[in-house]
């Protein structure tokens, strides 16, 4: 099957799962077909698929990503070098009060654990990259998740959670659902993933190896010190978990900006400061390459300006 035939096959298979969608005609236009397929994947609940569906889906998604163009970390140039010989005192994140951004981490039932790595001390490198994070070949990319952790169910929504779940494939929602079920069995049926923690999953059909899912703070009428601490905890927790699994490279999206209303400039300040301080405090960690991934030109300029001062 070519890409169009695979796309139509997947649409027809997903239509069979829903009595509401069965009567919908498959459009002839390529972009309309892509939107329909993505929408059907977005609203699909977590449940097993047939082997034939998964095989075709995997081939289709991997080809789509290849056609968009995969960016390898080796093609990027670092914008800052972080020497890792000593650990400085961390600066306060908001206001005058120093913030504790230790965070915690989750991996399908495992409790928080300290970062680990080799005994060899090496410099770390920061990168700034504007592009689609679902096309980046890093050891791990970070997903700005919500507390339900099973992805965005709004058809064709433009959030990063939707994009990552779409192009990873339906297996990712199943994995995240199983994780949430396990947590609910341990901690109660109403369990929601706490803000500032992280969970590691396979990346399935993405060019990265893993996905780090973290729930950022939702800012209300005004930014608070607690919001800043929780955002820092997202970054720290992801770095701890990446180090624990001996990963070398991690790409952060702009956590909590956009839908969660964290001011872009303050979010960037916290992101860079927290990552820099963590890298300097963990000279033996395997994590040596950190990418700040931006999508909007506004964020590109903010990060570029701040990183020039690093």
List the model feature ranges, each with a label.
Residues 1-96, 109-310:
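Macrodomain-like recognition of ADP-ribose-binding/processing modules
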């Amino acid at each position: 099957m070519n890409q169009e035939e695979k796309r139509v096959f997947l649409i027809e298979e997903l239509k069979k799962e829903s009595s509401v969608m069965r009567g919908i005609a498959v459009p002839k236009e390529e972009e309309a077909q892509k939107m329909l397929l993505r929408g059907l994947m977005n609203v699909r609940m977590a449940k097993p698929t047939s082997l034939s569906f998964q095989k075709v889906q995997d081939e289709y998604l991997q080809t789509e990503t290849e056609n968009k163009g995969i960016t390898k970390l080796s093609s990027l140039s670092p914008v800052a070098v972080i020497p890792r010989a000593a650990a400085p005192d961390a600066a306060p994140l908001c206001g005058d009060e120093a913030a504790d951004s230790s965070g915690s981490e989750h991996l399908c039932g495992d409790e928080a654990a300290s970062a680990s790595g080799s005994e060899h001390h090496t410099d770390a490198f920061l990168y700034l990259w504007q592009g689609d994070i679902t096309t980046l070949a890093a050891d791990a990319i970070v997903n700005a998740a919500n507390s339900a952790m099973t992805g965005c169910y709004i058809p064709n929504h433009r959030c990063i959670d939707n994009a990552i779940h779409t192009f990873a494939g339906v297996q990712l929602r199943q994995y995240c659902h199983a994780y949430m079920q396990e947590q609910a069995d341990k901690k109660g049926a109403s369990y929601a993933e706490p803000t500032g923690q992280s969970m590691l999953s396979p990346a399935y059909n993405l060019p990265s190896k893993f996905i780090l899912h973290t729930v950022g703070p939702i800012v209300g009428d005004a930014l608070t010190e607690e919001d800043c601490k929780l955002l820092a905890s997202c970054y720290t927790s992801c770095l701890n978990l990446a180090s624990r699994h001996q990963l070398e490279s991690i790409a952060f999206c702009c956590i909590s900006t956009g839908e969660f209303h964290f001011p872009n400039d303050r979010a960037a300040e916290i992101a860079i400061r927290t990552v820099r301080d963590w890298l300097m405090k963990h000279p033996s960690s395997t994590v040596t390459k950190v990418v700040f991934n931006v999508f909007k030109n506004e964020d590109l300029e903010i990060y570029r300006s701040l990183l020039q001062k690093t």
